[in-house]
Amino acid sequence: MTITINNYNNDKKNLILGLTGSVATIKAKLLVEQLIQHFNLIVIPTETSLKFLSDQDFEFISSKCKIYKDKDEWENVDLLKRSALHIDLRNWANSILISPCSANTLGKISNGLCDNLLTSLIRAWDYKNKSMILAPAMNTMMWENPFTFKHIETLKSISPNVFIIDPIEKKLFCGDIGMGAMEQVPKIVDFTINNLK
């Protein structure tokens, strides 16, 4: 399988938006609304992220851009053409934005694990020529955990094309007040525009 971009405006750059299992995924519709003004967009939600998307939001997103889920990786394997979806996605994209990036996904990708479509794409990413932008979102204690610091430092050490959009302090979904909320959507979009490879 090779990804076609016939439905896209080819003067725009190609961006993949990864959604992960954080409650901040409820902002995905707003993020997509703003990103599609600037980029050709493909969305890759993890299975856990889908629990935070309403049916209406999923329908809206799928009406604006292509969505690839974990099952698509295996349904589209073409051994004769020696094609894999995560490789086709990497070849298509100029950049990837993972927003929100959960503690779980952050830990996986910083340790090279690749057990779903999104993390397989990250494992095969071209860090020399393409940017990867992460917008973490998690509980304050998870954000302040020493493992989180190590994971972020590991990713930053891979390439100057890896960017972290630090979370902000506010009242979190769990009721705690502290650092860990995903940055505001307009700031994430602006950062992505300015740091796209």
Swiss-Prot record:
<dbReference type="GO" id="GO:0010181">
    <property type="term" value="F:FMN binding"/>
</dbReference>
<keyword id="KW-0210">Decarboxylase</keyword>
<feature type="binding site">
    <location>
        <position position="52"/>
    </location>
    <ligand>
        <name>FMN</name>
    </ligand>
</feature>
<dbReference type="GO" id="GO:0071513">
    <property type="term" value="C:phosphopantothenoylcysteine decarboxylase complex"/>
</dbReference>
<feature type="binding site">
    <location>
        <begin position="102"/>
        <end position="105"/>
    </location>
    <ligand>
        <name>FMN</name>
    </ligand>
</feature>
<comment type="subunit">
    <text>Homotrimer.</text>
</comment>
<dbReference type="GO" id="GO:0004633">
    <property type="term" value="F:phosphopantothenoylcysteine decarboxylase activity"/>
</dbReference>
<dbReference type="Pfam" id="PF02441">
    <property type="entry name" value="Flavoprotein"/>
</dbReference>
<keyword id="KW-0173">Coenzyme A biosynthesis</keyword>
<keyword id="KW-0288">FMN</keyword>
<comment type="similarity">
    <text>Belongs to the HFCD (homooligomeric flavin containing Cys decarboxylase) superfamily.</text>
</comment>
<protein>
    <recommendedName>
        <fullName>Putative phosphopantothenoylcysteine decarboxylase</fullName>
        <ecNumber>4.1.1.36</ecNumber>
    </recommendedName>
</protein>
<dbReference type="InterPro" id="IPR036551">
    <property type="entry name" value="Flavin_trans-like"/>
</dbReference>
<feature type="active site" description="Proton donor">
    <location>
        <position position="174"/>
    </location>
</feature>
<comment type="pathway">
    <text>Cofactor biosynthesis; coenzyme A biosynthesis; CoA from (R)-pantothenate: step 3/5.</text>
</comment>
<comment type="function">
    <text>Necessary for the biosynthesis of coenzyme A. Catalyzes the decarboxylation of 4-phosphopantothenoylcysteine to form 4'-phosphopantotheine.</text>
</comment>
<dbReference type="GO" id="GO:0015937">
    <property type="term" value="P:coenzyme A biosynthetic process"/>
</dbReference>
<keyword id="KW-0285">Flavoprotein</keyword>
<feature type="binding site">
    <location>
        <position position="139"/>
    </location>
    <ligand>
        <name>substrate</name>
    </ligand>
</feature>
<dbReference type="InterPro" id="IPR003382">
    <property type="entry name" value="Flavoprotein"/>
</dbReference>
<keyword id="KW-0456">Lyase</keyword>
